[in-house]
Amino acid sequence: MYVAVKGGEKAIDAAHALQESRRRGDTDLPELSVAQIEQQLNLAVDRVMTEGGIADRELAALALKQASGDNVEAIFLLRAYRTTLAKLAVSEPLDTTGMRLERRISAVYKDIPGGQLLGPTYDYTHRLLDFTLLANGEAPTLTTADSEQQPSPHVFSLLARQGLAKFEEDSGAQPDDITRTPPVYPCSRSSRLQQLMRGDEGYLLALAYSTQRGYGRNHPFAGEIRSGYIDVSIVPEELGFAVNVGELLMTECEMVNGFIDPPGEPPHFTRGYGLVFGMSERKAMAMALVDRALQAPEYGEHATGPAQDEEFVLAHADNVEAAGFVSHLKLPHYVDFQAELELLKRLQQEQNHG
């Protein structure tokens, strides 16, 4: 007979103590500091900030430490903390054209105004384990040079000026805020992009990959990927003019997608857009690919792949929600299982006597 069992508070406290001990690890080894995580695991910090919805490197590093390096748990911690924060102001729209560039590449033009900047990247490495890191070797040395950044307009703006793409203009409508109003489907472009930015990187990467394998009409080129620092400004009510309050390291991706030939308009390329905190380049590219796939209805395209189904994609992109729903299966379901068990036994008895 299956009966309900109550877990004791002492057992739960002991489980938490065990987890804390595992998180700390061998006490003979130096403890990993939040500053070390922030500086040396910077790409993990970038992901937690992006999907956690807070652009604070120290808090993201703290969440990673507390979560024993579990990205999804760290994102959950950051989301929970975010709910306690007051909304003090709304920043002015970010101007990525004025980005202080750390990296900028284009796969469609070799020579672009402002030039290409390779920047920090794992591209072109051989993906061989570097065993010298086991010896806690010397810090790498860099040779730096001061140079003035040239104006670097977006590659898509160059295409638009040639009539090869459409300018995207601000409609003036108030953007949705998915942190205050739950999204409904079909949703606006602003809501869609917010959900994609906070969506799980692995999930979006898989969907983006599916569009490349034929599950969705998509023939992309990396028009431009740029990473760098963007000024953030607000307009205080008592002043009435914009005041710079800091800067953010962000990565922006614009994908040049297959052209369309709409009636009454010249044929032109379409685009997908991605924007993330830090240098999460893979996430930005995946976001841009899925963004374009979700624009299928706007271009009158027949949806042939899961990446083109807006509600399916966006309703399942949030890893905090997904992890929570899957994890709830670990909670006691004794009564539910007992009901199914009794039903199964009754069906078997009816079959045996039938």
UniProtKB/Swiss-Prot annotation:
- Give the source's domain of life in one word: Bacteria
What reaction does this enzyme carry out catalytically?
methylphosphonate + ATP = alpha-D-ribose 1-methylphosphonate 5-triphosphate + adenine; ATP + H2O = D-ribose 5-triphosphate + adenine
Some GO term, biological process aspect, for this entry: which one? organic phosphonate catabolic process
What are the protein's UniProt keywords?
Answer: Transferase
The record's top EC class is: transferase
Q: Which Pfam families match?
A: PhnI
InterPro entries tied to this protein: PhnI
Is Transferase given among the entry's keywords? yes
Q: What is its EC number?
A: 2.7.8.37
Give one GO term, molecular function aspect. Answer: alpha-D-ribose 1-methylphosphonate 5-triphosphate synthase activity
* Gene Ontology CC terms: alpha-D-ribose 1-methylphosphonate 5-triphosphate synthase complex; carbon phosphorus lyase complex
Subunit structure of this chain's protein: Forms a complex with PhnG, PhnH, PhnJ and PhnK with the suggested composition PhnG(4)H(2)I(2)J(2)K.
User: Function of this protein?
Assistant: Together with PhnG, PhnH and PhnL is required for the transfer of the ribose triphosphate moiety from ATP to methyl phosphonate. PhnI alone has nucleosidase activity, catalyzing the hydrolysis of ATP or GTP forming alpha-D-ribose 5-triphosphate and adenine or guanine, respectively.
Other remarks? Answer: The sequence shown is that of strain K12.
What family is reported?
Belongs to the PhnI family.
> What name is this protein filed under?
Alpha-D-ribose 1-methylphosphonate 5-triphosphate synthase subunit PhnI
Q: Which organism is it from?
A: Escherichia coli (strain K12)
